[in-house]
């Protein structure tokens, strides 16, 4: 009975979330991309670029793997939990990259420079400009926010600020649409929450 109630609660969220994403794709994404292109400044590009570098998944993967492996002999919670952080970034990143190739959505620069906005699903584009949906950086950003704040509670405000900042930077730099960031964030958060549930606190 409890499982059925939980499942129904989850399903209730699907419709509004799906509606929000659809509305963004239809009416929000392109106008926001055009506005960002017209109003881009040196400051916004500098901040966005800094967050872009911070959101590269290899930083988190390298750090979490290093801590996990270094402390593995002790077999304590710190090692295991950092490897779960590694897994959350790796798994969510793989999911996002698979969807990118399948979806075939052109990035904002193609819309602005060439007027190309139509998706080409199952066209198997391998070019960067056709891998807009979802945002891989947003996926990593939310993994940093959820798992980073769980591992380092005192740094939770920093982790959430950094994670959300990384996601928003994709819109600021005009390399992703709003809906790309929304879906990427949801993938990252969902996988990270699942991994967070497997964390242990024993020493």
What are these regions (language model features)?
Residues 20-27, 90-97, 163-175:
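Aromatic-anchored segments of alpha-helical transmembrane domains
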Residues 55-71, 137-142, 148:
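Hydrophobic alpha-helical transmembrane segments
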Residues 30, 34, 75-150, 154-155:
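Membrane-interface loops
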Residues 22-23, 67-69, 98, 147, ...:
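Alpha-helical transmembrane segments of multipass membrane proteins
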Residues 2-15, 117-203:
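Membrane-embedded catalytic cores of phosphoryl/pyrophosphoryl-handling enzymes
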Residues 1-66, 100-124:
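N-terminal transmembrane-helix/juxtamembrane module of multi-pass inner/ER membrane proteins
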Residues 37-49, 72, 154, 200-203:
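Membrane interface segments of multi-pass transport proteins and intramembrane proteases
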Residues 21, 84-88, 92, 96, ...:
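Alpha-helical transmembrane segments in multi-pass membrane proteins
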